[in-house]
From Swiss-Prot:
CC annotations in GO: actin cytoskeleton; cytoplasm; extracellular exosome; extracellular space; I band; nuclear matrix; Z disc
Family: Belongs to the actin-binding proteins ADF family.
Modified residues (Phosphoserine): 3
Coiled coil segments of this chain: none
Matching CDD domains: ADF_cofilin_like (cd11286)
Motif Nuclear localization signal mapped to chain: 30-34
Role description: Controls reversibly actin polymerization and depolymerization in a pH-sensitive manner. Its F-actin depolymerization activity is regulated by association with CSPR3. It has the ability to bind G- and F-actin in a 1:1 ratio of cofilin to actin. It is the major component of intranuclear and cytoplasmic actin rods. Required for muscle maintenance. May play a role during the exchange of alpha-actin forms during the early postnatal remodeling of the sarcomere.
Gene that specifies this protein: CFL2
The name this protein goes by in its record: Cofilin-2
Length: 166
């Protein structure tokens, strides 16, 4: 069921910037988004980039020690969100980077919010072409352990996520 919610152009720009890994200067790399949250606008008509809810590559090792743990802390405990997380992980064969689309719908979120976000998910997913990994998360217990994301990325072949062993 479509909700009539549209996707703001800034959301698409953020996605395209995260998806394309072109050779960049060190300064440009630091400004790349590692993780970003998207929410509904106040009038519930648009999916927008949530202000100040992002992690930049340049933050890692500076204000952010562990990007995965910091990302989990950005998620609101009592409301839904969409998120993009640029996962850096290692399998037994090689190092990889993949974007993960996350639909955060905690049990404690209001029913109306869960319904609007669930019915609007297709609108944002259609704009995020080429995403290999999608994950619906219904509470902190599902996401706080990085090994759960490791399983989503490659089953039991993933040996580390963000440089930390699973």
């Amino acid at each position: 069921m479509a909700s009539g919610v549209t996707v703001n152009d800034e959301v698409i720009k953020v996605f395209n910037d995260m998806k394309v890994r072109k050779s960049s200067t060190q300064e440009e790399i630091k400004k790349r988004k590692k993780a970003v949250l998207f929410c509904l606008s106040d009038d519930k008509r648009q999916i927008i980039v949530e202000e100040a809810k992002q992690i930049l590559v340049g933050d890692i090792g500076d204000t952010v020690e562990d990007p995965y743990t910091s990302f989990v802390k950005l998620l609101p405990l009592n409301d839904c969100r969409y998120a993009l997380y640029d996962a850096t992980y290692e399998t037994k064969e090689s190092k990889k980077e993949d974007l993960v689309f996350i639909f955060w719908a905690p049990e404690s979120a209001p029913l109306k919010s869960k319904m609007i976000y669930a019915s609007s998910k297709d609108a944002i997913k259609k704009k995020f072409t080429g995403i290999k990994h999608e994950w619906q998360v219904n509470g902190l217990d599902d996401i706080k352990d990085r090994s759960t994301l490791g399983e989503k990325l490659g089953g039991n072949v993933v040996v580390s996520l963000e440089g930390k062993p699973l």
